[in-house]
Amino acid sequence: MLKEFKEFALKGNMIDLAIGVIIGGAFGGLVNSIVNDIFMPIIGLITGGIDFSNMFIQLAGEKQATLSAAKAAGATISYGNFITLLINFLIIAWVLFLFVKSMNKIRRKQEEEETSKKMSLEQQLLSEIRDLLAKKK
């Protein structure tokens, strides 16, 4: 049983998956930084200095000026955080879409090259017949 687990864990797909998860985690941090440190300030500037991280609806307690104070005072809906996460998601989805699209294009090109290199059985036989006829002349 231990041997089977070792074979399973050391298969290429499992290792590839582990590497993908690690890279995905690092990519998530990078996207968060891009969104929070670059895009959100620009969007805030365009929208008149609105700070999305501090946008909320307070459901209970006295009205507070900041999200952290409102959360301490009672229930809140943090829709600014949702907007930020939505932008994160859209950026990640767009980058992954471009990556998959380029990988599919590369794969299609390789398949076309392999297909053009491989001759069908008929083509091989005709080539052999042609070569034999050329030798007889």
Swiss-Prot record:
Pfam families: MscL. Its main location: membrane. GO terms for cellular component: plasma membrane. One of its GO terms (molecular function) is mechanosensitive monoatomic ion channel activity. InterPro entries: Mechanosensitive_channel_CS, MS_channel, MSC/AndL, MscL_channel. It is found in: Cell inner membrane. The keyword Membrane applies. SUPFAM superfamilies: Gated mechanosensitive channel. The chain crosses the membrane at residues 15-35, 38-58, 80-100. It is a multi-pass membrane protein. It comes from the Bacteria. Keywords: Cell inner membrane, Cell membrane, Ion channel, Ion transport, Membrane, Transmembrane, Transmembrane helix, Transport. Channel that opens in response to stretch forces in the membrane lipid bilayer. May participate in the regulation of osmotic pressure changes within the cell. Homopentamer. Belongs to the MscL family. PANTHER family: LARGE-CONDUCTANCE MECHANOSENSITIVE CHANNEL (PTHR30266:SF2), MECHANOSENSITIVE CHANNEL MSCL (PTHR30266). This is Large-conductance mechanosensitive channel. It comes from Bartonella henselae (strain ATCC 49882 / DSM 28221 / CCUG 30454 / Houston 1) (Rochalimaea henselae). The gene is mscL.
